[in-house]
Amino acid sequence: MKSINVLLRPMLKGGMGLLFLVLMLAACDAKKGKTQVEDTDEVVEVNDTTVYGVCGEGTSMHSLEIITDAGDTLVYTLLSQDAETEVETPSDVQGGLMAGDKMAVTGHKTADELVADRVINVTSLLGHWTSIDKNFTIEEGGTVRSAVKAETNPWTSWKILNGSLLLNRDTFAIDGLSADSLYLENANGIFTFKRQK
């Protein structure tokens, strides 16, 4: 401490030196108080409530028979919005119901039945999709292949999780899925894709 006094003595004769000393001490205290934030890539597992399986031949307009990947046969009621019934939330079916197609279903249980909230025809989702800036193929097994070599952040993987489509880390609601079009929505907007044949 004595050596600091010797060095700062000429500066302390004027008021400027005192100000400099106070600022130096304050800066040292500020550095001590800072804590470093650790960057971790910790993955949090999310419980997936989706039931996966194959659409059964017992499927009709108002019921979905699904043979689950575990081998169980479940029957979900499909609620529709029509003038005669007062359904608050109709079942959202995307991609159609075709016996033998792979399906992903989220739903809930009432007192006497299973009710489908969202049904995604995974077989219809597979294929080559294009838009103005995207050109990709959703393949079985969770792989996405991009046909645009210069794309900055191409999607490379996909999965259905709790009724939503995950492309890499981007989560989308499927607003529409048909034989020739796919509408995906997230916080950034609605994205339209056409099927490439």
What is the role of each PLM region?
Residues 3-16:
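Bacterial N-terminal signal peptides that target proteins for export
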Residues 18-22:
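Alpha-helical transmembrane segments
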Residues 24-27:
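C-terminal motif of bacterial Sec signal peptides marking the signal peptidase cleavage site
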Residues 29-197:
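Lipid interaction determinants
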